[in-house]
Amino acid sequence: MSRQIIAPLARYNLKLTVHYSWLLSAVLLAAVPIFIDPVLMDRLQVAKLGEFLVSLLGLIVYPHLGLLEDGGIQEVLYAKRVRHLPLFLFRWLLTALYIFLAVAALFTWIHGSGADFELWPMVGGTAITAIVIGSAGLTATLLAGNLSAGYIAGFSWYLLDFTTKGKLTGPFYLFGLLKEPWDNGKWLLAGLSLTLVLFCAFWLPRRRLD
């Protein structure tokens, strides 16, 4: 594929991916410092903030990706040269990068302001939780063809683990950072996220033919 096609296609997909939900999530994260005092926070308190609140960032920014095709976007112009899989993965990865940077910015400020915790395990673990919740919501949105279904599915998983403390989800427990500074179960959640996005990427062309 020539550079003349790649550049405008990348810009177009960037414009599609950067949704108003990004602005909403940024505003919500920016408001967090108003309600906390980092000097008084230990590792467990920061973990609760990340796992219970910041992780919902993923549910805000991911599900709409499952409905981008419903608006009749202009990728048909490149249909003979561009496969859908890399485009969908580009959008998902771009959103994952946004989540990681947003989480890193917030926790870097909290850490620098006096909170006592290991920074990067907290950033990575919280970002993975946000991404897997969002990917679950994205998958439900795609399968149901309805944005509300995505929000309900993602939040249902969140609520299930919040109330049962992982008794029903086992190694796929979302909030492992509450137990230790780094939970190896996060790697399973990261793998599940990749599995879900690959499923979505392969399923979406079928849905477009329905």
Question: Language-model features: where?
Answer:
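Hydrophobic alpha-helical transmembrane segments
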Residues: 1-51, 56-67, 139-142, 165-166, ...
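Juxtamembrane loop-helix boundary motifs flanking transmembrane segments in multi-pass membrane proteins
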Residues: 1-9, 84-85, 115, 131-132
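Secretory targeting signals
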Residues: 34-68, 89-154
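A cytosolic-side transmembrane-helix exit/cap motif
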Residues: 65-76, 139-143, 169-179
